């Protein structure tokens, strides 16, 4: 009965929005700040929005803020399911203060990006390959980072899967932070039956049996057990309450199928990730996640005991070591980049540019 009601809601929504589909599914920027939020969760200073179009995919929204001094590194954040760039504003501001330029790319069909289907709060993507293509286009076409400035991907939950898949697909990065990485389970279950249904294009856009439309009573991240912190735990829900276009409820059958396929692929091709990976969790992960961690060629892990999955939204006790680990990892890449630059200069650049010195052999 619940499934029938959910399907009926989807069909009614599609019928009502048929004449204005582009408006209903289109991208959204310039979000309104929720009045109840503390200033640390506001839009970072100098923040700017942009749109990215990749092939036939729906338009993607991204945002960027930089430091007031010369940037030391570039970080691209890949949010988890249901999050938007607004969820990460506090972290963006803190990373800016460390001297890093920070970009956030809203996922395909999520956040302020355009949607594939209606209703707008139904999570759907045909494949995580669209996330990979978006990341590669953002880096190569929009960011175009200087060769002497490290580029780091920071992916949360299933966003870590998208980040790692981009590296497997050839995106050149200097490091990847996998924050509470989440993979789909391998086991055969009722969910797998829905994944099989998701193979069909028509069925893939239907909601899962447990899907419910977004509502103000939808649990926030603290109520959902993602964080201990009542203020950070309310951030995403507050932004979605104030900005209906950001709302996302549960996933469709097709999204679950895409997640399962990406999870299997990221494990199978883990050996192609050449960049060092920092793996951050609050405790032991699923067997699938642990298998991936062990398969990565250059991966070191840090467990923050007692932390819940949304490490970037945790209370200070757990969030502080998480942030220090992220900032320290990026700083390591900055130091390495500087060391390599100095070696290159000593070997060839300086003598070639100083009159009276012979050219380097």
What are these regions, as identified by a protein language model?
Residues 158, 162-247:
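Alpha/beta-hydrolase-fold enzymes
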Residues 80-83:
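Active-site glycine-rich loops that stabilize anionic/oxyanionic intermediates
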Residues 18-54, 60-67, 353-361:
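An N-terminal hydrophobic leader/cap segment in hydrolases
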Residues 281-307:
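Conserved loop-alpha-helix segment in the C-terminal half of the alpha/beta-hydrolase fold
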């Amino acid at each position: 009965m619940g499934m029938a009601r959910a399907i009926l809601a989807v069909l009614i929504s599609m019928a009502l929005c048929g004449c204005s589909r582009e408006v209903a599914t289109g991208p959204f920027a310039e979000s309104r700040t929720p009045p109840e939020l503390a200033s640390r969760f506001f839009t970072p200073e100098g923040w700017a929005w942009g749109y990215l179009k990749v092939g036939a995919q729906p338009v993607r929204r991204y945002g960027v803020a930089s430091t007031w001094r010369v940037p030391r590194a570039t970080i691209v954040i890949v949010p988890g399911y249901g999050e938007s760039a607004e969820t990460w504003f506090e972290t963006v501001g803190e990373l800016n203060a460390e001297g890093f330029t920070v970009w956030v790319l809203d996922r395909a069909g999520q956040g302020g990006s355009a949607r594939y289907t209606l209703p707008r709060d139904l999570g759907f993507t045909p494949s995580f390959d669209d996330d990979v293509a978006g990341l590669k286009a953002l880096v190569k076409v929009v960011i175009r980072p200087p060769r002497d400035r490290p580029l780091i991907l920071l992916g949360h939950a299933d966003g870590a899967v998208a980040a790692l898949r981009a590296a497997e697909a050839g995106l050149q990065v200097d490091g990847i932070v996998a924050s509470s990485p989440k993979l789909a389970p391998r086991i055969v279950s009722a969910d797998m039956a829905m994944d099989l249904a998701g193979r069909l294009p028509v069925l893939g856009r239907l909601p899962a049996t447990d899907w419910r439309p977004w509502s103000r009573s939808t649990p926030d991240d603290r109520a959902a057990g993602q964080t201990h912190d009542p203020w950070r735990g309310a951030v995403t829900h507050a932004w979605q309450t104030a900005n209906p276009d950001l709302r996302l409820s549960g996933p469709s059958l097709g999204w679950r199928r895409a997640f399962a396929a990406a999870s299997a692929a990221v494990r199978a091709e883990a050996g192609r990730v050449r960049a060092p990976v920092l793996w951050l969790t609050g405790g032991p992960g699923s067997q699938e996640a642990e298998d991936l961690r062990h398969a990565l060629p250059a991966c070191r892990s840090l467990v923050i005991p007692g932390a819940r999955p949304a490490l970037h939204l945790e209370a200070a006790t757990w969030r502080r070591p998480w942030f220090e680990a992220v900032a320290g990892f990026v700083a390591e890449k900055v130091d390495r980049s500087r060391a390599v630059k100095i070696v290159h200069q000593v070997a060839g650049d300086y003598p070639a540019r100083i009159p009276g010195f012979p050219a380097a052999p």
